[in-house]
From Swiss-Prot:
Family: Belongs to the leguminous lectin family.
Native source species: Canavalia boliviana
Role, per record: D-mannose/D-glucose-binding lectin. Has anti-inflammatory activity in animal models when applied intravenously. Has antinociceptive activity in mice when applied intravenously.
CDD domains: lectin_legume_LecRK_Arcelin_ConA
Protein name: Lectin alpha chain
Amino acid sequence: ADTIVAVELDTYPNTDIGDPSYPHIGIDIKSVRSKKTAKWNMQNGKVGTAHIIYNSVGKRLSAVVSYPNGDSATVSYDVDLDNVLPEWVRVGLSATTGLYKETNTILSWSFTSKLKSNSTHETNALHFMFNQFSKDQKDLILQGDATTGRDGNLELTRVSSNGSPQGSSVGRALFYAPVHIWESSAVVASFDATFTFLIKSSDSHPADGIAFFISNIDSSIPSGSTGRLLGLFPDAN
């Protein structure tokens, strides 16, 4: 199975797999059962921003999800990613719908990682930024139902021709270049990621959510991972 570390923006509470009984953000380490969650007031039809930070000195993974009106949610969890992830990874965005649905639209996405080496004082860095997504976006690996180019956005899950969200959909987008996330001689490995998103639904319960994830470089969508598994995990263990 793939090795996944993720920050989930979970719009639908699946209490049977340990979710709190409200929309939340969470940190997932190799399991959809979040290690830490925080209540999140998801604003239907409003553009939000997610900012994710990790620094190997503090070994803390943190995320803030906010809206223009100042409403925000924060979650953090202490984890040594050297012990969890392979040295080379890919970073991506994933989203699903299930019985209930929502649009999982990404308007922008940026990422920066840095490795400061002990021996050479060199910094190995990777940076990318998408302020819009073209129809033929060559530097993204699209999986499942993900498409680019509609209004310059990335649609992670299926929408109809008039933009209505469809159920039982899963899609992911990964940056094409592998990221050197840690190495034994590095003093500090750090990264930060930011994406802006629009979740819109006419359902009384929008579902299921968006996640920023880091995985082994050959990661693919597990079969049956629509809905509560967020396109990341093969089961709810």
